[in-house]
Every structure is written in C-alpha cells, then in structure tokens.
A protein has these predicted regions:
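Juxtamembrane helix-break-helix junctions at the cytosolic face
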Residues: 26, 53-67, 87-88
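Short, highly charged, low-complexity non-transmembrane loops/tails of multi-pass membrane proteins
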Residues: 124-139
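Membrane-water interface at the C-terminal end of transmembrane alpha helices
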Residues: 105-126
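Hydrophobic alpha-helical segments of small multi-pass membrane proteins
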Residues: 69-83, 100-111
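Non-cytosolic membrane-interface motifs at loop->transmembrane helix junctions
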Residues: 30-39, 67-71, 93-103
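Membrane-helix boundary connector in multi-pass membrane proteins
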Residues: 81-99, 117
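Core segments of alpha-helical transmembrane spans in multipass integral membrane proteins
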Residues: 10-18, 36-59, 71-81
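Membrane-helix boundary elements
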Residues: 1-4, 12-39
Length: 139
C-alpha cells in the first residue's frame, strides 16, 4: 500500500512539474495544438503536483490522511471520464488514452481497495478509543 502511494505521489509530482514547465513538449507529443493561454494547464499542473504531495502524506500516515486519497480517487475517476469523452468526440487524439491509463485509470482499483481498508481501520481505531458507556449511539 505505502509503496503504491509513494509511486503515485512521485509520478504526480513529476507529471505536475512537467505540466508547469514542459507543457509545450506535452502538446507536441500528443499532436495537439498549443492554446494561447497556458495558465489553465499550469494551474492543473499545480493541482496534480499537490495531489502528489497528498499521496506521500497518506503513505506516511494512512489513517489520519485517508481523506486525501478519497479526493485523489474522485479526481482521477472524474478526470478520466471527461478525458475519455474528449477522445470520443475527437477533441483529443486517441494517443491520449495510454497516457490517461498510466496516469489515472490504473490507480483507480488499488486506490479503491486502499480506501476501503483505511476506512475499516479508522472505524476499528474509533471503536477501540471509545469509552465503554458510548459504545452505541442513538442519533
């Protein structure tokens, strides 16, 4: 689990940095016309990099930082749906699909499993730390 989160974190940091500094190479590689305003791509790079930091935080303290992983899961899932829609409409070339797969889609199943495991561990920790008189809550 921690190794996967470290890999995802490092990948996101590098991907974010490349979106900020080397965006022109990315456009060339994908065969997409570079827009006049680059700011949205660079802001997205900042967010991708911040998720990289977040995945490293989850790896360092999984239960405490588990909600960062939930945000990352939804971010990867929703951005994958939108990107596939753009490929389907022809706005992005089909060559973008392998990039999307390696950047986002491949992480969805393990992130989901890790999220479930961490939620169960957090619930167990909560039960252990709860005083006996508060074992059941009624609204």
């Amino acid at each position: 689990m921690r190794l996967l989160l470290r890999v995802a974190g490092s990948y996101n940091l590098l991907a974010g940095l490349s979106m900020i500094c080397f965006y022109h190479e990315g456009y060339k590689l994908l065969g997409v016309t570079k827009p006049e305003l680059i700011l949205p791509v660079q802001v997205m790079g900042i967010l991708v990099g911040l998720f990289g930091v977040g995945y490293h935080l989850v790896a360092a303290d999984p239960i405490t930082n588990r909600n960062i992983l939930v945000l990352g899961f939804w971010s990867k899932g929703l951005s994958s749906i939108f990107a596939l829609w753009y490929v389907g409409t022809g706005a992005l070339p089909a060559g973008f699909v392998p990039v999307l797969f390696l950047s986002d889609i491949v992480y969805l199943p393990p992130f989901y499993l890790i999220m479930r495991r961490l939620a169960a561990a957090a619930e167990e920790r909560k039960k252990r730390n709860m005083p006996e008189g508060n074992a059941s809550t009624s609204g």
